[in-house]
Regions:
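Conserved, structured core segments of small domains
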Residues: 1-138
């Protein structure tokens, strides 16, 4: 079965990773390099195990456009969202034998090197991907 692993971040998180002054301490170049090396290794392991279907990191929320229907008319709003709002930062789609295995994969993300304040608040969601209408029912 396929599962999507989702991670989240705010505009402040993206700014801090880029080394910009923000409400959160800026990441050092070493912090960022360690995170990138971990993600490359994590992804390589999933490729080698045959479990990786796709993965992508998303750009900062400031580059977002939201389309919403208001009084029957599509209205487009440019980012940024409120700086403290967490939005989707990246995802992995994995194909593995069970929800438990997908959860094990996601749990490895908790070991990603990052400044302490990031590690304390980082979360990953794991969701099964529906292949049929019946799987959409709960």
């Amino acid at each position: 079965m396929k599962y999507m692993i989702l991670t989240y971040g705010s505009q402040q998180d993206y700014d801090a990773m880029a080394g910009k002054a923000a409400d959160k301490p800026a990441w050092s170049a070493e912090d960022f390099a360690a995170m990138v090396a971990f993600m490359q290794s994590f992804t390589k392991d999933l490729v080698e195990s045959g479990e990786l279907v796709d993965t992508r990191g998303l750009t900062a929320p400031v580059h977002t456009r939201r389309v919403q229907l208001q009084q029957g008319v599509p209205v487009v709003t440019d980012g940024p969202y409120a700086e403290t709002q967490e939005v989707l930062a990246g995802y992995w789609i994995v194909e593995c034998e069970s929800f438990d295995r997908a959860t094990e994969i996601a749990a490895r993300l908790a070991t990603c090197p990052a400044p302490d304040y990031v590690a304390a608040s980082a979360v990953a969601d794991v969701r099964p991907i529906a292949d049929s209408q019946a799987e959409l029912e709960h």
